Every structure is written in C-alpha cells, then in structure tokens.
Amino acid sequence: MSMNPIHVVGGGLAGSEAAWQIAEAGVPVVLHEMRPVRRTDAHHTDRLAELVCSNSFRADDWTGNAVGLLHAEMRRLGSIIMSAGDAHQVPAGGALAVDREGFSQAVTERLEAHPLVTIAREEIAGLPPQDWDSVILATGPLTSPALADAVLKLTGEDQLSFFDAIAPIVHFESIDMDVAWRQSRYDKAGPGGDAAAYINCPMTEAQYEAFIDALLAAPKAEFKEWEHVPYFDGCLPIEVMAERGRETLRHGPMKPVGLTNAHRPDEKPHAVVQLRQDNALGTLWNMVGFQTKLKHGAQTEVFRMIPGLEKAVFARLGGLHRNTFINSPRLLDGVLRLKAQPRLRFAGQVTGVEGYVESAAVGLLAGRFAAAERLGRPAVAPPPTTALGGLIGHITGGHLEGGSGSFQPMNINYGLIPPIAPPKRDAEGRRLGAKEKTRIKKRLVGERALADLEAWLSGAQAVAAE
C-alpha cells in the first residue's frame, strides 16, 4: 500500500531527528534542506545536523543532571542524534562532547542510506504547498523571512528574536602547555573516563583586571538590523557579561573553583579560561563560554592576553547569529501542531527550546507524533514526569500569563519536571544533609522518568500491534 510521505523542512538536528523517527516507524519522509542552494552565515558545510555553535551536548549523567536524563530518554527511543553523538564523542569531563565533523557526516550518511528517506536540496519559501498534508517545520534559528512572515500572517502573533553567539576555536599546537594544564573541574571523569578533559589557562588578579579592561574597550561588530534584539541568557557574549559587572566572568565561565594549577599548585588562580576538545584528533579546542561579538581583529588581540594563549592560532573566531522562535504556548497544541493549520507541526529551536539536545528532542517527538497519525494511531505526548514530557509541556503550555514576551527559550531543567520528596534519613537512620537530599532527589526523578517512559513506550507499542 502506497503512503503519502511526511515532509520535514530543515535539515538541522531537529529535522534530521524527526525524519529518522518517521522513517524508522515505517513511513516515507522527504527531508528538505536549503543548503547548498541557499547558504547561511552560521553554517560552514552542506551536511545535515551541522553543529554551528559549541560541540557539547552538556552533562551526560542521567542520575544527576536534567540534560543527562534527556540523553537517556532519547537513547531509549532510538535517537539518531544521540547515537551519532555517542559514536563520535571526544573527551569532555562529565559532559558529552562530539567531533562535529564526524558527527554531522554520520547523521548525513545514515539518513541518505535509509530506504524511506528522500533528501531534497531546495528552499521552501513561505508556507508549504497545500497538498502536503503533514509537514514538520524544523527551520531552526535562521528561519527564512518568507516563512516567518507567512506564519505571522497565519497566526497574528508577534515574532520574537534574539542573538546566539559563537565561541572561538584554537589550534592545540599553538597553546603554551608550559603555562596551561589539563584538568576537569573537581577532577570529574566523563563518559570516556577522562578526568583531565579540559585545558586550563590561569590568570592572576592583575591579568584578569587588564583582560576585563581590554574586553570592555574592544570594538564590537555592529548588527544594525538586529540592534534592539535581546540576547538569550544561556549564550551571552562575554563582553556583555563583563558589562554587567567586572566580577561576572570570574563567577561564570572563568570561575577558578575545582582547579589546581599543575605548574604552580601552591598558587590559586584568580580566574581560569577553559578550553574543551572540539574534534576527535584533539587538534582543535574551543574556548568554553567565550561566545563573542567582538570584531575579529579585536578578538585575536584580546584573547592573546590570556596566559597560555599568547601565540594562539585561531581556526575559527567568534561571531553571532540570529535566533527566531514562535510563541509556542499560544500557537501549538499538545502534540506540536499549529492550531491555525494542524497539518503543520513545528520542531526544534523555532519552538522556543534552547540547546542542541533539546532541539533534537522536540524533533524526535514531532517525528513520532506525525508518524503515529499517518499510521492511524493516536499521537500521545510522553508523561510530564519525563524530561521529554517536561520539555514539551513547557513549549505547549508554559508561560501563557505575563503579557508579550513572557515566553522565552528554555533549556531542560528539573524545574520542568514534577519534583519528588527525598527521604529525610539514610538507611542507617542518619539525618541527610541538603546536598545529599538533592543528589538523592535527582536520582529518584531520573528513575521515575525512565520507568514512566518505558510504560509510555510499551503503551504505544501495544497500540501498534493491534
């Protein structure tokens, strides 16, 4: 029996994941990606699922971190993004970071090889054709003006935009390891068991103050078209953080806690700049939290003030790209359909989630929902006790009150998942401290989430077997 394909517009993380989930459900899918026909300022290749900002999927521990729990849930649901990430991971302490080239190449090759996936290299300008009865719009942070305007006219909603900034990448051989040293914060080992996954560059108080002075005085790139657009707090440029207070960076990405200078163990650094491995070869390292909109000449001058980076050679300098998202709680139903035109679904960053994993997670759900409908089955969201359920709950039901602009992009966090009261005493009857209670509570939330996800998945499989 022939079946009309589902169309997915956008070949980023969300679109790639959505297409994979649809095809794995046995439904044909056409994945439309405008590159290379039309390029963007943020992308550098024509591959699917290209990572344009950091190479980190963040913490991977499902027992102690909400994004780690999201990782675990996505793995259970056969995520192509998590599978490719696991296959191409690079050392990153307690985080899951990936070789960006190998990762996107793997996603591209697997989708190209799938018999139910057709990849169309073309731009879909404006709303998709009316005869496409099931469409997922996963157009990402650089949604084309034509499509954005069409959605605005359809819904009557105001468009919301903000900046995302990109951090520089440094060639390893140009880092002075007689000054810098390798260590993960608190010597915490990551998925690969490496407790020395970061390169650390120390600063004295005088060096830090001089760095802040230079940072504040450096010329910044002008983006007049977007000059009144707000930043997303999770991706603030370092110069914007510095403008909020001279100590802000020292308590943010440059905090020295949990680190000991291997060359001078008796001297406590006033601040530390960390670099994280960016590719499998270990030849490229990105400056953690150093997203910036400084002009390129100023970046090389200011960042070479950092001890250990005096002769740094940059493979990529920092920059900015725009992010556009819709007012999802008003516009979308509980299974990500546009209320004004239910044949259209949205997925990824355009829905108001922030982060690679979150974008892929919403793509995963959109793909499963669309495939279920095509197969005549009910599209049912995961339980709110799961990370996936908490995330979709935020974008389809969160922040309706508070007026214009109250709905803002959100990373996955425990605040989106119903809490569990931890025990007050341990097995020996000793009263638990606050830190121990928090640790136990996070683990209990994770255990409940995975059990509830399993029950939800079993229910979906039972319906499919009928």
UniProtKB/Swiss-Prot annotation:
The keyword Transferase applies. Its EC number is 2.1.1.74. Its main location: cytoplasm. FAD binds at G10, G11, G12, L13, A14, G15. It catalyses: uridine(54) in tRNA + (6R)-5,10-methylene-5,6,7,8-tetrahydrofolate + NADH + H(+) = 5-methyluridine(54) in tRNA + (6S)-5,6,7,8-tetrahydrofolate + NAD(+); uridine(54) in tRNA + (6R)-5,10-methylene-5,6,7,8-tetrahydrofolate + NADPH + H(+) = 5-methyluridine(54) in tRNA + (6S)-5,6,7,8-tetrahydrofolate + NADP(+). It is an enzyme of class 2 (transferase). SUPFAM superfamilies: FAD/NAD(P)-binding domain. GO terms for biological process: tRNA methylation; tRNA wobble uridine modification. It is found in: Cytoplasm. InterPro entries: FAD/NAD-bd_sf (IPR036188), MnmG-rel (IPR002218), MnmG-rel_CS (IPR020595), MnmG_N (IPR040131), TrmFO (IPR004417). PROSITE patterns: GIDA_2. Disulfide bonds: none annotated. GO terms for cellular component: cytosol. Keywords: Cytoplasm, FAD, Flavoprotein, Methyltransferase, NAD, NADP, Transferase, tRNA processing. It comes from the Bacteria. The keyword Iron does not apply. Its cofactor is FAD. Pfam families: GIDA. GO terms for molecular function: flavin adenine dinucleotide binding; tRNA (uracil(54)-C5)-methyltransferase activity, 5,10-methylenetetrahydrofolate-dependent. Belongs to the MnmG family. TrmFO subfamily. Catalyzes the folate-dependent formation of 5-methyl-uridine at position 54 (M-5-U54) in all tRNAs. This is Methylenetetrahydrofolate--tRNA-(uracil-5-)-methyltransferase TrmFO. It comes from Phenylobacterium zucineum (strain HLK1).
